């Protein structure tokens, strides 16, 4: 899904629509607006990463929802670099999916964490109905099956420090 694709109708999509409409109000004041659709940030403080690593150290790795769900992601360092560059370089204008070109399934995400932290950890799937009950509308944040396109970002010449999940998690685990 790229920046020009039709938006969804769930809670997250509506939040993005509202935020981008608010950003458009600044067109009267400036000639350049950058709208960032930031995918899941990979950082040591990001809950999914933090708790997946912690629980894996204890021998259990939770699979949140379906193991086939897609994680569109970007390392926090790369997101910070883009934000800085988007302020200082006029080549950035319009809407950008701030994501790597390498989305990953939950299953592969868990396998990487287990490989790096505890290869013998047991994977336990948390049922979707339980997550829907606990999280309500916010469940749509983690129940993702679409892959974002980062082509517009890449076509600007943006260079990732971490374009592979293995490298990103290695960096986080070693912090």
Please name every model-derived segment:
Residues 86-137, 173:
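Mid/C-terminal beta-alpha module of Rossmann-like enzyme folds, strongest
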Residues 53-61, 68-103:
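Alpha-helical substrate-binding/gating segment
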Residues 6-12, 38-46, 66-76:
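Glycine-rich "substrate-gating" loop/helix at the edge of Rossmann-like oxidoreductase active sites
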Residues 163-175:
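Amphipathic terminal alpha-helices
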Residues 106-111, 132-159:
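Conserved C-terminal active-site "lid" loop/helix of NAD(P)H-dependent oxidoreductases
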Residues 1-36:
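Catalytic helix-loop patch of NAD(P)-dependent Rossmann-fold dehydrogenases
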Residues 17, 29-31, 42-51, 86-96:
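Glycine/proline-rich active-site loop of Rossmann-fold NAD(P)-dependent oxidoreductases
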Residues 79, 83, 98, 109, ...:
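Non-catalytic, hydrophobic alpha-helical segments
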């Amino acid at each position: 899904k790229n920046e020009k694709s039709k938006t969804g109708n769930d809670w997250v999509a509506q939040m993005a629509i509202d935020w981008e409409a608010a950003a458009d109000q600044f067109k009267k004041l400036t000639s350049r607006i950058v709208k960032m659709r930031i995918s899941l940030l990979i950082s040591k403080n990001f809950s999914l990463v933090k708790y997946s690593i912690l629980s894996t150290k204890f021998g259990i790795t939770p699979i949140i929802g379906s193991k086939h769900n897609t994680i569109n992601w970007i390392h926090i360092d790369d997101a910070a670099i883009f934000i800085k560059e988007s302020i200082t370089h006029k080549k950035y204008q319009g809407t950008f999916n701030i994501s790597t070109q390498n989305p990953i399934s939950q299953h592969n995400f868990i396998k990487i964490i287990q490989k790096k932290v505890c290869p013998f950890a047991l994977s336990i799937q948390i049922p979707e109905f339980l997550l829907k009950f606990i999280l309500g509308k916010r469940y749509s944040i983690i129940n993702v099956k679409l892959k974002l396109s980062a082509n517009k970002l890449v076509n600007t010449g943006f260079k990732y420090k971490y374009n592979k999940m293995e490298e990103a998690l290695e960096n986080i685990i070693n912090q």
